[in-house]
């Protein structure tokens, strides 16, 4: 069976195989690569979590790209970078010339806007989307749709939307807002306002968080990586609290060159729930983010 559109948790891949006797082979592609760019083959190793190897006559290159869309250098093995495509399966360009700006670092190399890494054997591993798309159940959501709706509220100064891990849909949109100075409004009111002003139902934020100040870069742009970390942390906290009500966890979200994001869990008060270690894999099986338990006993 083939699968695409969004990353699938390893636990779901394994469960499907156990129940049906059939393997799911994850692949990757887009309209610009005539649907398919990589796949798992019937021969050789099938690496669960990767999207396979390039198809014949297709080249995939991982590179560091500057803000103007130019190649800085090629990434090392297992180093995360922009996924570039070339070959007979790659389209020659968009009809609207403005859409071609910054997506062709070289004449024959198309920048997909996705981020990933190639391992030693040429398997591709997706780790993120450079353009911040939120994928909810295979449905691509432009965060700008969510942000524009919230920004239309008279008491909202600025809004930013990111994807939060979700056990059912893979990701769901959540929003962070900074209010106009002196304004008072509840998070539920903002969530209702957004829902009523977004025509695309899937883009309505499931949660809205009011922040004193949103994180920004040195040039004043909203720094979404920090907001994603907050969203991931909240999702893990919710799952852990539901499963281990008597155990207190500290979560540390770290950047990882190979994995993208790594979630470090530290149990600081088990209060009799010493068996939580054996239960963690089941509780967190739907998360695609890599996580590790910090052993504080040694």
Predicted regions located by residue number:
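Conserved AMP-binding/adenylate-forming
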Residues: 1-4, 8-27, 31-124, 131-133, ...
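Conserved nucleotide-binding/hydrolysis micro-motifs of P-loop NTPases
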Residues: 7, 32, 183, 215-216
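Conserved beta-strand termini and adjacent loop/short-helix elements that scaffold enzyme active sites
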Residues: 27, 63-65, 162-164, 211-213, ...
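Residues at the N-termini of beta-strands
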Residues: 82, 157-158, 207
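AMP-binding/adenylate-forming catalytic core of the ANL superfamily
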Residues: 87, 92-93, 101, 107, ...
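Conserved short beta-strand edge segments in small beta-sheet-based binding/regulatory domains
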Residues: 199-210, 246-247, 283-298
């Amino acid at each position: 069976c083939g699968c695409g559109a969004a990353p699938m948790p390893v636990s779901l891949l394994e469960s499907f195989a156990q129940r049906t006797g059939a393997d799911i082979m994850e692949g990757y592609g887009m309209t610009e690569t005539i649907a398919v760019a990589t796949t798992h083959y019937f021969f050789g190793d099938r690496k669960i979590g990767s999207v396979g190897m390039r198809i014949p006559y297709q080249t995939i290159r991982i590179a560091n790209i500057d803000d103007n869309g130019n190649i800085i250098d090629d990434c090392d093995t297992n180093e995360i970078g922009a996924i570039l495509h070339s070959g007979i399966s790659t389209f020659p360009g968009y009809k609207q010339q403005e859409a071609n700006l910054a997506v062709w670092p070289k004449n024959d190399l198309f920048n997909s806007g996705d981020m990933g890494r190639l391992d030693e054997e040429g398997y591709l591993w997706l780790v993120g989307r450079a353009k911040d798309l939120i994928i909810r159940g295979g449905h691509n959501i432009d965060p700008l749709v969510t942000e524009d709706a919230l920004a239309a509220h008279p008491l909202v100064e600025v809004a930013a939307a990111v994807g939060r891990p979700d056990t059912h849909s893979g990701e769901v949109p959540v929003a962070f807002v900074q209010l106009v100075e002196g304004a008072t409004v509840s998070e539920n009111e903002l969530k209702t306002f957004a829902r009523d002003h977004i025509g695309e139902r899937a883009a309505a934020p499931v949660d809205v968080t009011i922040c004193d100040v949103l994180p920004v870069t040195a040039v004043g742009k909203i720094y979404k990586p920090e907001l994603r970390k907050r969203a991931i942390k909240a999702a893990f906290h919710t799952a852990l609290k539901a499963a281990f009500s008597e155990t207190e966890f500290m979560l540390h979200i770290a950047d990882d060159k190979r994995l993208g994001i790594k979630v470090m869990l530290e149990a600081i008060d088990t209060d009799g729930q010493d068996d939580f270690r054996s239960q963690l894999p089941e509780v967190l099986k739907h998360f695609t983010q890599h996580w590790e338990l910090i052993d504080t006993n040694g």
